[in-house]
Amino acid sequence: MKERSVSNFDIVIFGVTGNLSRKKLIPSLFNLFKNKCISNFRVIGFSRKIFTDKEFRLYIKDSLWQEETDSLIEIFLNFFVYVFGDFNEKESYKNLFKFLDRSRETIYYLSTSPAFYGPIINHLKKYFLSEKLTLSKIVLEKPFGSSLETAKKLNSLLYSAFKEDQIYRIDHYLGKETVQNIFTFRFGNSIFENIWNNRYVDFVQITVAEELGLDGRVEYYDSVGALKDMVQNHILQLLSLVAMESPIKFDSEFIHDEKVKVLKSLRKISKEDIKNYIVKGQYIGSQVQGVFKKGYKDETEFLGNSNTETYLAMKVFINNWRWSGVPFYLRTGKGLARKFSEIYIQFKKPSFTLFNNSSVDFSNALIFRIQPRDGIEIKFNTKKPGYNYEIQTANMEFSYHGAFKRLFDEAYERLLLDAFLGDGTLYATSDEIESSWEFVSDIANKWADIEICNYFYGSEGPKEIDSILEKDHFWRKI
């Protein structure tokens, strides 16, 4: 298949001197350039730091240093220009306009705090965007609001300047190879799609665990928590991909429609039952490999009485024909034993087995490993070599790095290229955002009485999460 590529465009990065830009966006753009996926483009950096173009390029080069490609980096840096500006000042946007080529497509990337989304979009719309509207796109990072109401306000703001097919709401988890492969694995292999339902699936477990705590980000995080920070976007996006019906064709519009149907089918949890479905946790200080790690409340003085969850485990159900009665266990947390993300699908045990004397668990499992090692694993049973008829569990593994020579090492590479090409399949739509916020906001309005369970920094999380499991179900080890 011919390599996807695009040329003749400008990308304006608002907040270009921030961490996201330096660590993710610029290296991803360089790799796309190195692999000849983009050409004849310009990166227009917009920020409040004072730089000449030369100083800006040296600043960018620090995040790209690779000895074997040094000459290529020098060529790449020639595509960069810098515009000094304040996100709230109209003169800054008038100055930016002078740098734009009205004959080329312009992608506006908002690598900023959400607090600046309003000023940036309003200034773009007011001063010059309307003159080249059809040649513009906008890419923005989460959070997409802090509630259903604010998400709707953000969507209204975006629609005042852009059409839906010009808006790209990025969720980097959707750019990971294993996540993308859920779609192909299901609908491209009949042996799996035929058992992808409540007749065969016992439960589904989605885990997004982070090893690091909130170092330096507690003031922002304390107003958000794990429910809004992780469940509303990453985890519900993964759930919708696993649970969706087959679209009538491989097209972004139809794929998004099926994902929305799943989100709208999530069963609301009553206030009376919420304690049986959700466990909230918060990490406390602990020794980790000989180093003391502070607890969440120890990060700053003002957190002394905080009940913000740094860990969340929950059980949800989907009210449709395919998944009725199948629990989906969702969990995410910070300050855990390791960085680890996966989707685990446990299949039901056969109603009858020939091997009643064996202690082996005869339920099979399918695992999508998202990080740290991208891959897919199938757990099955086999005869152990030897004179006796012993059965043991074995794993059949597929590794991306072992099977393919070239990978997108960074999810942003694929997502950026898709945006440049106008492919919104791996981006979230307004309907998805609002549907997920509707579910999450309903929980947030009901769970005030749930107590926070403490867990040690560097552990697996609070032990109380076992209380929400159905009979014979279990949590995977982190």
Curated annotation (Swiss-Prot):
Gene expressing this chain: zwf
Q: Where is the signal peptide?
A: none
Annotated family? Belongs to the glucose-6-phosphate dehydrogenase family.
Which GO CC annotations does the UniProt entry carry? cytosol
Catalytic activity annotation: D-glucose 6-phosphate + NADP(+) = 6-phospho-D-glucono-1,5-lactone + NADPH + H(+)
Q: Give a short account of what the protein does.
A: Catalyzes the oxidation of glucose 6-phosphate to 6-phosphogluconolactone.
Choose any GO biological process term that the UniProt entry carries and state it.
pentose-phosphate shunt, oxidative branch
Pathway per the UniProt entry: Carbohydrate degradation; pentose phosphate pathway; D-ribulose 5-phosphate from D-glucose 6-phosphate (oxidative stage): step 1/3
According to its UniProt record, what is one Pfam family this protein matches?
Answer: G6PD_C
The residues responsible for catalysis, as annotated, are H234
| Residues where NADP(+) binds | R48, D86, F87, K142
Q: What is this protein called?
A: Glucose-6-phosphate 1-dehydrogenase
Please tell me which top-level EC class this enzyme sits in: oxidoreductase
Provide a Gene Ontology MF annotation, just one: glucose-6-phosphate dehydrogenase activity
Which residues take part in binding substrate? H172, K176, E210, D229, K334, K339
Q: What is its EC number?
A: 1.1.1.49
What UniProt keywords are attached to this protein's entry?
Carbohydrate metabolism, Glucose metabolism, NADP, Oxidoreductase
The superkingdom listed in its UniProt entry is Bacteria
